[in-house]
Design a protein with these regions (language model features):
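Cleavable N-terminal export/targeting peptides
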Residues: 1-86, 111-115
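Short N-terminal helix-initiation segments at or just after the protein's N-terminus
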Residues: 61-66, 225-227, 266-275
């Protein structure tokens, strides 16, 4: 989702724009599409909507970004003065975000000596509830925004293992997403805007479809019980909104992400048919299009330290492994540290 409020974006515009809106005080949506208002407000709203949907697709793509269930600011105990390492704003943002992803992948019966096919799908839910301070010098009351996104993704793909230690994967998928935005006007000044903004900028819902193809190349080397793995994956997103005849809600989505990750797994031991290993990982993620705008950076880095547990016979056929560990995001709007939990790690 776009990681800053649309109302903050409007508040940051020139003072003459705010004054003109107050003077207009029109109770219809036409106020948002006449004259200079069209040039000022509509592009902001459309970019924010496109960024919101693109960021949500990235959030529920487990190979691109992970949001932890406990977040912290590593700059509090790492003696490095670097704004890209973390901060109070990033930590507060991650605590405001709540996500649930329910994925499932099944092998298909069509396969050959060096290739196999599969289908995968996932249901996703994202929410951000937060307070917004506007015109504090006139009224300290805070507005409240609730943003919810529901998604369903389905894809089919092929693995090709024709070269020793190498795997190539091609996948074609698509998703449907629904955004619901609720905005409570508590501030006396912001209430002036409510007749103009409701249904367009605030208190509305919107649907989109997205095509999401991806290509991945993986190298894996094992010796003894150690494992070294490199994985490179490029994912593209293209989509449009549908079901709305309001011009600001007619949105095109174009974005991509390219993740390169190096993993090293070191065996620890085995207990009750469960294998334990420590895993180190380092990633660089390059973003373009609407994802670049949403994360406010063209690229960021992730560093992970995990305890990986193979499930053995306990999860045969559906659960290969689970892991718990620390993840550090460097350079994006989600910078900082997190305690994370994953399963079926690649």
């Amino acid at each position: 989702m776009q990681f800053y409020s649309w109302m903050h974006a409007i508040n940051a515009r020139n003072n003459w724009l705010v004054a003109s809106l107050i003077l207009a005080a029109l109770p219809s949506h036409a106020a948002l599409v006449d004259g200079h208002l069209e040039d000022e407000i509509l592009p902001i709203l459309q970019r924010n909507l496109a960024g919101t949907f693109a960021a949500d697709a990235v959030i529920h793509d487990r190979e691109t970004v992970t949001i932890g269930f406990v977040n912290f600011d590593p700059s509090g105990f790492i003696p490095i003065d670097d704004d890209n390492l973390g901060g109070d704003d990033a930590n507060r943002l991650k605590n405001e975000l709540k996500t649930i992803t329910l994925p499932l992948t099944l092998a298909l019966p069509w396969h050959g000596s060096v290739w196999e096919s599969y289908v995968t799908g996932r249901l996703g839910y994202t929410q951000r509830f937060h307070d917004i301070s506007l015109f504090e010098e006139l009224d300290p009351s805070r507005d409240h925004e609730k943003l919810k996104i529901y998604s369903a993704f389905f894809a089919g793909g092929v693995h090709w293992d024709g070269l020793k230690n190498w795997r190539f994967t091609a996948e074609l998928g698509g998703s449907i997403r629904r955004l619901e935005q609720e905005y409570t006007y508590n501030n006396a000044i912001s209430q002036i805007f409510q007749p103009v903004f409701d249904g367009v900028l605030t208190n509305f819902s919107l649907n989109t479809w997205m095509l999401q193809p991806s290509l991945a190349l993986q190298y894996q080397k094992r010796w003894s019980k150690h494992k070294l793995k490199y994985r490179s994956r490029y994912a593209y997103m293209h989509g449009e909104s549908f079901g709305s005849d309001i011009p600001p809600h007619q949105v095109d989505i174009k974005a991509s992400s390219w993740r390169n990750t190096l993993y090293y797994s070191h065996p620890i031991g085995r207990m009750l048919d469960i294998s334990f290993a420590g895993q180190l990982s380092a990633s660089r993620v390059d973003l373009s299009g609407n994802t670049n705008e949403a994360f406010q950076t063209p690229h960021y880095y992730e560093f992970g330290l995990d305890l990986l547990m193979g499930t053995g016979a306990y999860g045969e056929g559906w659960l290969d492994n689970v892991s718990i560990g620390l993840l550090f995001n460097y350079g994006s709007v989600l910078k900082g540290g997190s305690l994370v939990f994953n399963y079926n790690t690649y």
